[in-house]
């Protein structure tokens, strides 16, 4: 198994004990932890932005969200991946396969996982493999 880049929705589920998918995400990570997990600037910023919104079901202050994420990423099983691919690079992204704005971040994160030789773990069932050159089913893990 290869390292899994966790989508923002998976980070939220893992790091929010009140999240509806917390147990499912936790059980998955327990099974997969030996392969490692990754975050990047997009997923880290997205986690903090969403969980600190007043409308989020269990909001926390920004400082607490950052602290929670820092604790989670301080483990040996975590890697930080720099955002090293571009959505504009036609060698990476098949633009015609981006069907809507809600797919943009998922496709980008899948492309980053492919570039890193890893997997993209998400709850989002609408990420099209065909939008990323070289992406195969083993690169995308829908929890």
Pin down the residues of each PLM region.
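Short, well-structured N-terminal submotif of metal-dependent ribonuclease cores
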Residues: 1-39, 51-67, 132-135
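Alpha-helix capping/helix-boundary segments
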Residues: 10, 43, 86, 126-128
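Conserved beta-strand segments of alpha/beta enzyme cores
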Residues: 36, 77-79, 138-139
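Short, hinge-like loop/turn segments at secondary-structure boundaries
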Residues: 55-57, 99, 138-141
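Active-site neighborhoods of divalent-metal-dependent phosphate/nucleic-acid chemistry enzymes
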Residues: 75-125
């Amino acid at each position: 198994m290869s390292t899994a880049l966790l989508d923002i929705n998976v980070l939220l589920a893992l790091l929010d004990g009140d999240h509806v998918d917390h147990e499912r995400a936790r059980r998955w990570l327990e099974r997969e932890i030996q392969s490692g997990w990754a975050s990047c600037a997009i997923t880290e910023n997205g986690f903090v932005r969403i969980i600190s919104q007043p409308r989020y079901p269990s909001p926390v202050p920004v400082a607490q969200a950052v602290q929670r994420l820092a604790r989670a990423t301080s483990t040996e099983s975590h890697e930080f991946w720099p955002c090293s691919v571009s959505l504009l690079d036609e060698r990476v992204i098949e633009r015609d396969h981006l069907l809507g704005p809600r797919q943009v971040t998922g496709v980008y994160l899948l492309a980053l996982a492919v570039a890193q030789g890893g997997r993209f773990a998400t709850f989002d069932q609408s990420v099209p493999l065909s939008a990323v050159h070289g992406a195969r089913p083993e690169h995308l893990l829908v929890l």
